[in-house]
From Swiss-Prot:
Tissues/organs with expression: Highest expression is in adult heads.
Annotated TM spans: 378-398, 417-437, 451-471, 494-514, 532-552, 831-851, 870-890
Name of the protein described by the UniProt record: Dopamine D2-like receptor
MF-aspect GO terms: dopamine neurotransmitter receptor activity, coupled via Gi/Go; G protein-coupled amine receptor activity; G protein-coupled receptor activity
Organism encoding this protein: Drosophila melanogaster (Fruit fly)
Amino acid sequence: MLSPFDWRRGISSSGTGGTMAAQPLSSTAATTAAATGATAATAATAATTSATLSTAAASTSTTAAPSAGATWINHHLAVEADSSQPANGSDAQAGVEGPTMPAGYLPLYEDVETAAEDAGYALIDDISEWLLGSVGSEAAVGGPENSTNLAVTGANGTLAWLEALNSTQPAQSNSSAEDGERGRYSLRSFVEQQLAGGGAAGAGDGGDAGIALIDSGEEAALDNVADAETDYGMLGGFGDAELLQRTATVARETLGNRTAPSTTSYDGGGSGDVGVAGGLAGTAGGGVGGAGGSGGSTFMLLLENFNDYFPNYNGSTVSGTSTIAPGVAITGSRGSGLLLEQNLTGLYLDGYRLNCTNETLNLTDSCGELRVVDHNYWALILILFPILTLFGNILVILSVCRERSLQTVTNYFIVSLAIADLLVAVVVMPFAVYFLVNGAWALPDVVCDFYIAMDVICSTSSIFNLVAISIDRYIAVTQPIKYAKHKNSRRVCLTILLVWAISAAIGSPIVLGLNNTPNREPDVCAFYNADFILYSSLSSFYIPCIIMVFLYWNIFKALRSRARKQRAARKPHLSELTGGSVIENIAQTRRLAETALDSSRHASRILPDEAATNTASGSNEEEDENAISPDIDDCHVIVNDKSTEFMLATVVEETGNSVVAQITTQPQLVVADPNGNHDSGYAASNVDDVLAGVAPASASAATSAAPRSSGSPPDSPLPSGATLQRSSVSSQRRPTGDDSPKRGEPALRSVGVDNSSVAMKPLSFVRYGVQEAMTLARNDSTLSTTSKTSSRKDKKNSQASRFTIYKVHKASKKKREKSSAKKERKATKTLAIVLGVFLFCWLPFFSCNIMDAMCAKFKKDCRPGLTAYMMTTWLGYINSFVNPVIYTIFNPEFRKAFKKIMHMG
């Protein structure tokens, strides 16, 4: 971020909106010296020294034009000092040989409200101020010809420099003007000299090398930190002095790794560490441009040594063998600038972080906090999600283990999915809650790698299990014969093992060292390998999701095609029914119907079984929506008198609101003798799918049909061999006294059925006797008959006949097929909902993940922020909590199993 400008060592807050005002170096020197107990004379001497430096530098400003970096900084300095200067574009100040403002300003771009950025600026600021200040020029004190003689002391220039850094504390002035110039204030003097076009004898080479610190350093490092608050807060809670002290301590322990500088020539700003003084001041004593260039190049060496002595994130030191030594080809402005940018980038942008827990060096200084963090205690509420996720997925696993009806191929995959969700709740979510509440990652790196690896493995396993489920559903719907032939537990177990093996293969590289990259941050648990992020996101999410969407689309098309065919063949008219067809007779109602016989004009009533017991195997939830709907053709009761032709009359079904149904006559069917002498002793072979019909009394009776009466209704006839039926419910009860038929009322008998379509078993297993299921008794209401009177009347109609229930296998098979198809559709819909919720929960995270990797890989400023990552990550975790809820709502079998386990049903 290039604005607002801030002079880090000369900050003066106006108190209004945090506006920063620049202060001259002379004022700063006096103030600082006075604050540290220095005399007024000392402060005045420091101020005078600074002004002398600026004057001396300005006198040489015409020898060389400033570099592009110097011109850019110069322009902005001028704008700050003089509001009449152009506010944009450096061209307006091109070629200017000095600032138009008082000397002594160090331009740095700082967002004072961002701690991480502040720490990033502190790195460049401290390197600049203490690194250059410790070996600063004495040009103003002893003259240019002596500039290199007093720069540093000690046999080893590099170590002496580090010791000088250690002795220089922030906001402190040394006891003398010379020490102050050599120490704290030399950098500002140097910056002013370079902005004024210093480095005359060296043709600006030394000056360009110094400007590179401000130009290349800030552009390479600080501009990158502006949009990465948490990524580059590398100094955090460490004080500036502590950083330098630690650096010096590390240097003493690792002298063998440094780059040995040349110290053969101190004259004329020669090579070696002390050549920095000549290069920086631009006073190469020999008057040769190479001398100034050497000063700049050796300045690069200092930075490289600084890098060599700095411990990296895991406590080791950067090897000195990688140091780039200066040479003829890289001296001068261009070579020095490139070296500085490279070394400074290697030092800072590669992500050096202080990590006390991992350092093995003998560091005596306290580590302190990595950075100032805020604890988010509100995030503790998120602990509810792992608890609820654990509870729900345990219910899923126990339900399948305990209920044999749930032990299907699809549900085995659901168990595998529940195990993955269970691991998310136990292993992944707690670490995520900790990280969010604590505000920083303070656990060892190996724990972070384990957390990330389990996150990858579990989410990958979840989606691979959904892929396996979608393949299973696709084969079951599109190739049912093949599916029934090949499905077995062994194949399912192998598939599940393969799913987990692939998931582990994708996530395991994280714990094997793949995440140990140079830019790793100890207090942030994240994944830093952009290539692996791209690979894992594609292989574990995007490609499988494309496969699942394709499979489910084909499943839905197949189901839609099947539904169309079922609707086309749905509910034919009674006249179109063939032998063996089934029309169900409902027995579980409150009060059904009444009929009368024309021949006697005697009102008869059919008394329903009021104490009915439901013996159906399937619930209403499992009935096929394409089955015969309860409309006007659904409820049928047949009565007959032996002396008249068969009549079917109006029937009333009472289910809260009466529904009137008209049915037809069937002259071909015969009922048994009302005397009850030929009652059948057989019932349906499966009580679960009983059909409330009537049985043939005898072979002879089945063939003795009376001709149709001319007065019968003109409706289409009921086909031969049809059995009457309504729903898959049958009722049985013991008749009470009121239930017995009264004299003069014909009893309901049985209707003939095509024996080829009927299989019968003895009725002995029916609890109360199905034959007593329905009787004719009450006089609640009557209906007039719909046929003409017959001259014959059965004198024995007072005897209660019985009623026999049969099962037609053909109809039962169709019913089972419909029920099975219904279950297949419901299971597929449930799994499709699971898939949709999964995509909704995880797609945002993987989108952010792959965007971050692409931006990092191609070095674009488009990476999503920390807030987006946190929100999308937790949205993905919530998917593990939602899955059991989906089963509870949309799957009645799981719902029943859940209730049973929790003792709620």
